[in-house]
Amino acid sequence: MIRTDAKDGALVLFSGGQDSATCVAWALERYQTVETLGFDYGQRHRVELECREGVRDALKRRFPQWSHKLGDDHLIDLSVLGSISDTAMTRAIEIETASNGLPNTFVPGRNLLFMTIAAAIAYRRGLRALVGGMCETDFSGYPDCRDDTMKALQVALNLGMDTRFVLETPLMWLDKADTWRLAEQLGGAPLVELIRVETHTCYVGERSELHDWGFGCGECPACKLRKRGYDAYLRGESVTEAPA
């Protein structure tokens, strides 16, 4: 029998980065209960996990309309993923494009595993929506960020758990400039500033210098994309080309 007793709540995949923080705000605007979930999988930029608590605390302090909705946080040790992955996200190697055309920051199976674990937790917690920051427009080309992948995964999870999860991907068709705009629409300039200062995107974990667009090395693909998105957002434009 299909489980139908899930409450009006969401579990958000929350890494501590720009996209997932925007998704937390998006969920807080729509659901009565929002819980967050992070994973420690041996990522080089583990500093992003250290940003999670600061982002959550800032959301509670600066947005009283959301504070009562923000529920428990869950952090899962997924070091096994790092141990079986040979990528620039989990190894101190140069970031480059692999022979298959994907950047070597791609961690095979990562989002599939993240969403499956999220579904298991949401099932136990009685939450219906699973929210992730996957998108097809940030030029990385990760196959586990594609809309088709998420739709297929929703079907598989619902069949496998005999329930009615909804996988929400509010950033799926947004570029980085649009993501900044969404933050402004959700929480105005205060949310944009919170995300600029409190979140982390840099692949190499650099957090010693605050740029106009946030902390980072300024040279890795993630930093370049975040900067281009922020600059385009300020100009009222879109990001139309991949970072050089």
Swiss-Prot record:
HAMAP family: QueC. Zn(2+) binds at residues 202, 217, 220, 223. Catalyzes the ATP-dependent conversion of 7-carboxy-7-deazaguanine (CDG) to 7-cyano-7-deazaguanine (preQ(0)). One of its GO terms (molecular function) is ATP binding. It comes from Burkholderia mallei (strain ATCC 23344). Keywords: ATP-binding, Ligase, Metal-binding, Nucleotide-binding, Queuosine biosynthesis, Zinc. Its cofactor is Zn(2+). This is 7-cyano-7-deazaguanine synthase. Belongs to the QueC family. Disulfide bonds: none annotated. GO terms for biological process: queuosine biosynthetic process. ATP binds at residues 14-24. Pathway: Purine metabolism; 7-cyano-7-deazaguanine biosynthesis. Its EC number is 6.3.4.20.
